[in-house]
Amino acid sequence: MEALETHARWVSETLVSGGRLFFCGNGGSAADAQHLAAEYVVRFERNRRGLAAIALTTDAAVLTAVGNDFGYEQIFARQLEALSSKGDLLI
């Protein structure tokens, strides 16, 4: 339970300070990353303003270009290099 509370605190602090959440995963976890990002952006259980969340698993062109040019192990790092800022959180 302590790990979950810590995670929730990190997410809350990131969003309150204007940071963005980035989600990534491989295989089935890639689908989970997309689902979680969508819940933050759209809504979860009740209407509220959208929250800044991005799944790094959605752009096939970027994923395959990075994999081809830099190696599969760089597909998320390269996107974070281009898109993230200090204060963002990778999940």
Put a short name on every predicted segment.
Residues 10-84, 89:
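Glycine-rich, small/polar surface segments that engage phosphate groups of diverse ligands
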Residues 1-7, 13:
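An N-terminal, well-structured beta->alpha segment
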